[in-house]
Amino acid sequence: MIVEFFKKLFVRKKKIDIKLLPSQGLFYKEDLVITITSASKNDIEDYEKNYIRDDIGVVIYYIKKIVERNITLSKGYKYEDIKSIDIIFIFLEIVKLTKGRPINLVYFDKNKDKDEKIEFGSKNFNYLRLGNLIEYYDYKHRCFVVDGYKYTLPSIGVENCLTNFLIIKSAEEDSGDYN
């Protein structure tokens, strides 16, 4: 009881506007609500201890782990339903909430021949530009329909299943068949 009281007191929460995610919420049902909480000290220590800058697989694994631990979805949804394209954005929102301040990302500006900073947020990052593709979007089914085929973005669940399949197959004797 006391632990829950202190959690409510110190753990920050924030509702994510799914229309500001890279997927723009186009592939989620209208009733989905995503709420994030600030990361725990254990989450941060685990991430920092195991972070390997040059191993993208490890980086993605720990990003997903932190998102899974610090996300609450409306009833009927689970972590695996989140679209893969949204995971990094949600992770950075968790970091921003945890730190209590904006995140500045450093990039190299070729025109100025120097490093520049840009504040992370939906105003500065536009991941999905639909253009003429929007004419194929089915608002009822929340997907694109082209020549009778429905298309949507892969979810974390699909991505994880495919990754696990490839890991298992790569360990088998005939793994060269999958390259």
Q: How would you name each of these model-derived features?
A:
Residues 1-179:
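Long C-terminal interaction/binding lobes of large macromolecular proteins
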